[in-house]
Amino acid sequence: MDLVSRIENLPIGKFHYTLLWVVGLGWMFDALDTGIIAFIMTTLVKDWALTPAESGWIVSIGFIGMALGAVFSGGLADRFGRKTVFATTLLIYSLATAACAFAPNLTWLLAFRFIVGLGLGGQLPVAVTLVSEYIPAHVRGRFIVLLESFWGLGWLVAALVSYFVIPHFGWHIAFLIGGLPAIYVYVIIKKVPESIPYLINRGRIDEAHELVQQIERHAGVPVIDTIVVKPVAQKQQVSFRQLWSGRFARRSLMLWLVWFGIVFSYYGIFTWLPSLLVKQGYSVVQSFEYVLIMILAQLPGYISAAWLVERLGRKATLAGFIGACAISAYFFGQADTVFNIMVWGCLLSFFNLGAWGVLYTYTPEQYPANIRAFGAGWASAVGRMGGIAAPIVVTHMMVAHDGFHQVFMMFTLVLLAVAAVIVILGEETQGKTLESIGL
């Protein structure tokens, strides 16, 4: 049995859950630093007397960094290792977030937010690739959705920090708290193993075998001494053209369109949700309270997606959740009472974040090991283009007459288009090993 198959056939146990928690907490810190700017913007706009264009660029500059980070981290992860890039990117965005607290003006804040984006964008595709390569096919979808659920926890922490800190101590302290995850790099170095397919592709066969034996020993299964490596797993040259050659062209087109649409809608909605509610006449504290409740709805969204993704499959679950999110966005935009805002806001949050969990499962399943992180990184990078566009579009629409309703009508149409792309171009990958999908 080859090394990758030995990992694939391990029983689910402590090793897998430890990996999920350690990487998941890193994912949570990513969400904390992403989410905290949404709440800081409500007071920063007033403190610095920012124009809509300036406030839009504070958010968009981060997505420019995220796009570049996603592109380069994929190639770097295939060259230097998933673990190394995962730890490095976490350190980058944590330190840059703390530096934002000391920004004396808009120019410096934009520079620091760009660096934050480099780290944030680089971490996510690498994290999901690393976990995917250790989880057996029959539960991989569930584990990746559970990994993505840490994103909801991160936004919840961001909302709690903002609710208790910003009104009393100011946004500078909130940024400093966002820098604390830098300490967590030590845990990653100690607890996270390097990817087996990566080690094989780099010719480090003995190191990969030793790691597999160590995992087998801890799992309580017979330790195999023979080293077998499949030819398909051997080191290959990675190029951008591979993403658009043969069977991968359709997959890449589907992923790029879906990533662009879902990132555009997610960050356009949730990054500006507190500010949109304030513009509707609610106080800053009220907007924080409402968004906090909506964020809580993300957690059952992840759980339901984790259950459905191994029953209905990736394609049906993803398209269904995004379609339901589109309906929720429409009615949220029409809501004129607190009750309706909360009901449709919670459903919007439930379906949107559940869809994210499925998307992070689905993305690395489209490519073989030697271009997996590279392909996932490019899909994420194209998505960040949507993140760059969304804040600018939303800030301009917000100042128009009936802007709130127009914004959510736009997101409804975008989400419906994304669901259609999945139905038309998507391939089902449920229950297949990563290597068989890439063949």
UniProtKB/Swiss-Prot annotation:
Chief site of localization: membrane
Cited PROSITE patterns: MFS (PS50850), SUGAR_TRANSPORT_1 (PS00216), SUGAR_TRANSPORT_2 (PS00217)
Cross-referenced CDD domains: MFS_SV2_like
Keywords attached to this entry: Cell inner membrane, Cell membrane, Membrane, Transmembrane, Transmembrane helix, Transport
Subcellular location: Cell inner membrane
Domain of life from the UniProt record: Bacteria
Cellular component, GO, one term: plasma membrane
Keyword Transferase attributed: no
Disruption outcome: When compared with a nadB mutant (with blocked de novo NAD biosynthesis route), the nadB-niaP double mutant requires at least a 200-fold higher niacin concentration for normal growth.
Protein purpose: Functions as a high-affinity transporter of niacin (nicotinamide or nicotinate). Probably substantially contributes to niacin transport when its concentration in the medium is very low.
Record protein name field: Niacin transporter NiaP
Encoding gene per record: niaP
